[in-house]
């Protein structure tokens, strides 16, 4: 089974446009997290009985760490718009401070204001108004306290980087990024050059969320990758 893992402020349904395009030979499940801490969400993934993990952004970071913690549980991993972490100490400290500031603000604000701020991020500037509107109900269904806890326990500054560990990951790994997302395109290529059985794929006409902007292209990349894994 393919387990689709959502990003921050998403429900599993955000993956539906891609999941519905996978062939029947790859049944899937869209994960709706009941837990809102890093360890809680990692536990959900590890107990899911999935053989393939597909995660976006935060979901990708979770997928990598699940695979590293229990590599024998999985046959392949796909990460989209994700990274193995921030290595530079000063940058990590800055990110922790920024995430804590945001978490404190989130705890004090209504979800409507939180979503409005989230949607104004430069990272999502290339997404169409229609795409943003389609994602909004899932974002508005989030609980602010849960979002704050997730930031504090699973933020990029909080989590230790796992670049070194990736060198020993004995699993097929596909790292996907949008061509308009320079930072995560670079991260995908680095993942591909670090893990021994990894490859990168850059999706044209897409930014940080290629699975939303180009779902058919992402579904095709995942299908080809899983076919290659199945064929040895």
Predicted regions and their residues:
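Catalytic histidine-centered segment of alpha/beta-hydrolase-like enzymes
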Residues: 206-215
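Short beta-strand immediately N-terminal to the catalytic nucleophile in serine-hydrolase-like folds
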Residues: 53-55, 80
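Conserved HGGG/HGGXW glycine-rich cap/lid loop of the alpha/beta-hydrolase fold
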Residues: 1-36
């Amino acid at each position: 089974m393919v387990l689709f893992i959502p990003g921050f402020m998403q429900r599993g349904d955000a993956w539906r446009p891609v999941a519905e395009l996978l062939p029947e030979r790859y049944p899937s499940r869209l994960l709706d997290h009941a837990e809102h801490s890093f360890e809680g969400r990692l536990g959900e993934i590890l107990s899911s009985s999935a053989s393939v993990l597909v995660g976006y952004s935060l979901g990708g970071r979770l997928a990598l760490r699940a695979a590293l913690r229990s590599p024998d549980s999985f046959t392949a991993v796909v990460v989209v718009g994700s990274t193995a972490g921030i290595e530079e100490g000063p940058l990590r400290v800055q990110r922790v401070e920024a995430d804590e500031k945001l978490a404190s603000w989130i705890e004090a604000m209504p979800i409507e204001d939180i979503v409005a701020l989230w949607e104004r991020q430069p990272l999502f500037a290339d997404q169409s108004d229609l795409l943003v509107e389609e994602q909004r109900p899932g974002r508005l269904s989030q609980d602010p306290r849960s979002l704050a806890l997730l930031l504090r326990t699973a933020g990029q500054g909080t989590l230790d980087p796992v670049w070194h560990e990736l060198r020993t990951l004995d699993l097929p790994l596909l790292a996907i990024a949008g061509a308009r997302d320079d930072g995560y395109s670079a991260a995908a290529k680095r993942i591909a050059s670090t893990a021994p059985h990894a490859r990168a794929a850059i999706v044209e006409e897409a930014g940080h969320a290629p699975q939303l902007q180009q779902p058919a292209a992402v579904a095709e990349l995942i299908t080809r990758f899983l076919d290659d894994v199945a064929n040895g």
